[in-house]
């Protein structure tokens, strides 16, 4: 079996925290217990400070964060996490379960913000090389459903306050990218919770068994 990096992706309110719990439970049932958890942006001292800058609407006062500055902060946080936490863990045979990775940037900034996708791909390759998650679970939910759930939780960060149009563009890009990459498995997160959990368990179990074959 190769490296074991599983990432959970999706719009706000898609249910990533619940999905992570199901992934962990499924892996443990398969005898896998040596794992760590990451989130993006974040996961290291530096990356957490960058997270605060890019997501907290109060962090820069009245200054507007430009789209390109936003992208670069996401990548600065990401490469710090990958190089100092994720890669060392994978090298030791530890499983890594991530809350978001590069697919978020390709969808949110490439789709939602409309940043040139060729530029994003070039930046990704320069920063990450060929490093990719081994399995990505994309929890697909409409912005109407996802944002209703997110807003019920309380305070929204800077990106969560974007328009429905922004999230519709983001979702469209997620779906486009998922259709192009066999390592990305789409889960219908608009289903009842039991059905979503069932699909996650089945997807993870099948993938682990395929890797072990």
Swiss-Prot record:
Pfam family, one: Thymidylate_kin
Keyword annotations from UniProtKB, A to Z: ATP-binding, Kinase, Nucleotide biosynthesis, Nucleotide-binding, Transferase
Coiled-coil segments: none
Superkingdom of the source species: Bacteria
Keyword Nucleotide-binding: yes
InterPro entries: P-loop_NTPase, Thymidylate_kin-like_dom, Thymidylate_kin_CS, Thymidylate_kinase
Molecular function GO terms recorded: ATP binding; dTMP kinase activity
GO cellular component assignments: cytosol
GO biological process: dTDP biosynthetic process; dTTP biosynthetic process; dUDP biosynthetic process
Enzyme Commission number, as recorded: 2.7.4.9
Catalytic activity: dTMP + ATP = dTDP + ADP
CDD domains given in the database record: TMPK
Residues noted as binding ATP in the record, renumbered to the chain: 10-17
HAMAP family hit by this protein: Thymidylate_kinase
Similarity-based family: Belongs to the thymidylate kinase family.
Chain's role: Phosphorylation of dTMP to form dTDP in both de novo and salvage pathways of dTTP synthesis.
NCBIfam families according to UniProt: DTMP_kinase
Name this protein carries in UniProt: Thymidylate kinase
Gene: tmk
